[in-house]
């Protein structure tokens, strides 16, 4: 039920951005063709069906508990990073700005992530999206779209997933012993945070929020 609600909420948010003109404006500013957009979303959707197991995490406290298997979902984690490389060809924010804002988003996302015995790591998007959007507009008003995307994706990946991996060992009662980074596919926080950060930044820019 929660998954369907998240899907509907995501569609509603994108519909709002479309109504405000933010989605169209982002596509135009990044000079993304309809063909490139279709290919990108196709890769993300197909990648969501593919998971690659990396290694296992043994519980340090309960040796009798089966290890938690850790993997990556290609659509939810790898494809957003490929998008990042593509976007860098459209705009080129300064690398130091990327590092600074990524560190900020990581610091915001980390405490807003909780461990769930059923689903593993649950990340709340609001902090990543808003901090990346506002930070990008302040640091680089020219290349704010790609800066917001980069910081949101990397900050969510690091603060929401990677830094919480040690805590997975403590979830001895998890019903699902396999956890995928980016496991939500196109509905995963890593994938959505970057897209929403760009559109939020564009909305703030149009409103002359800063």
Region annotations inferred by a language model:
Residues 1-13, 30-39, 125-126, 133-210:
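C-terminal transmembrane helix-loop-helix hairpin of multi-pass membrane proteins
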Residues 46-100:
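A glycine-rich, hydrophobic loop/mini-helix early in the fold
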Residues 91-92, 113-120, 138-143:
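Membrane-interface helix caps and helix-loop-helix hairpins in membrane proteins
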């Amino acid at each position: 039920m929660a998954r369907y609600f998240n899907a509907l909420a995501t569609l509603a948010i994108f519909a709002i951005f479309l109504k405000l003109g933010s989605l169209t404006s982002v596509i135009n500013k990044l000079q993304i063709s309809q063909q490139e957009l279709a290919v990108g979303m196709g890769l993300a959707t197909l990648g969501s069906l593919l998971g690659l197991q990396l290694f296992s995490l043994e519980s340090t406290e309960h040796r009798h508990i089966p290890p938690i298997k850790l993997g990556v979902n290609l659509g939810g984690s790898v494809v957003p990073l490929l998008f990042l490389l593509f976007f860098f060809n459209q705009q080129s924010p300064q690398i130091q700005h990327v590092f600074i804002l990524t560190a900020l988003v990581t610091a915001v996302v980390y405490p807003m992530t909780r461990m769930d015995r059923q689903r593993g790591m649950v990340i709340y998007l609001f902090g990543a999206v808003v901090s990346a959007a506002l930070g990008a507009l302040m640091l680089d008003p020219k290349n704010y779209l790609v800066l917001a995307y980069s910081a949101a994706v990397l900050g969510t990946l690091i603060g929401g997933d990677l830094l919480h991996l040690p805590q997975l060992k403590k979830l001895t009662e998890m019903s699902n012993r396999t956890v995928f980074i980016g496991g939500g596919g196109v509905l995963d926080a890593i994938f959505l945070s970057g897209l929403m950060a760009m559109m939020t930044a564009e909305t703030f820019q149009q409103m002359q929020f800063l």
